[in-house]
Amino acid sequence: MRTALLSLTFLLAGTMAAPAFAHTAAPKKKVTATTKKGKILPMKEYIDQLMAKMTLQEKIGQLNLMVAGDITTGGALDTQVGSDIAQGNMGGGFNIKGLNKIKALQEIAIKNSRLGIPLLVGMDVIHGYETMFPIPLALSCSWDTEAMKKVGEVSAKEASADGINWTFSPMVDIALDARWGRISEGNGEDPYLSGVMGAAMTQGYQGVDMRTEEILRANRIMACLKHFALYGGV
């Protein structure tokens, strides 16, 4: 029990490493957004106004993710998924691959839904998108955070070019039991190593500081550290 609690403490500390690194970046232009009427607002103000306009059903809809199996080839407007997006009942998709398919779905969200909120399109980009790198467990053996960051950068560039804007990575579960079946996705059994390598991968995906326009560049995607604490072999 003591070992598990200690591992959890270091795991949580490791997952907070990326924001800590972010504070070393030089100040950059703040993120803004453009309304449908062409007005440019600070991102926080834009989001506050958008949230105020949303119905409860639309807020719930933002929590719904479609999976790739729900999407048929062509004719997105004619599917139930297309209807759900247009009605604001769908916030994003998971493991949908193909730029034309994603573009068609995004056009429904932006042009046909009441508020024009774009979809979040996520995928398990674990160790590369088109270019395949060694698995995270192997990469972590190098203790090379710059190499890990580069993997994130290349993965983000390739995935974003295909319409992906969100990855379910890095995985920072601490692998203390070899019987657990997902050890290859993580950085091994050392909590400190898992933290610094996970932070480096996150920087590669997102850039250094999400509070600036860097995250909006075409070659960036959002990271999502996983999984829930105590899910892995701890």
Predicted regions mapped to residue ranges:
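N-terminal export/membrane-targeting signals
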Residues: 1-22
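Glycoside hydrolase catalytic-domain context in secreted enzymes
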Residues: 21-234
